[in-house]
Amino acid sequence: EKYPQAIHAMAHITGGGFYENIPRVMPITTSCIVRKRDIPSNPVIDFMVNRFVMTEKELFTTFNMGIGYILMVDKNSHHSIFETIQELLKNQNGISVHTIGYISQHQGNPTVELI
């Protein structure tokens, strides 16, 4: 209600992880660039990464790297949306908000790119 034009897409990161769920909500000719360094450390995920031999794509598909939901928002409204969500989640243990990437233009179908 507060940001009617600023939230462009939302994706619940379930089975299929980043590579299947994010492209479903993106327009053609866009790419979701995920900055791995901005994904918060998670002890359970760290344990899985160290315990199992998996490719990066398998980790992001199977374990979602601890990310459960993604919002794609207008870059000019990002800061105020971020603060609003932080305020809404302040009493929710274990739930937090992070900026982990951005959308860019590219040729072809929607993609997810890890950097």
Language-model segment annotations:
Residues 1-115:
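Glycine-/charge-enriched secondary-structure boundary and capping motifs
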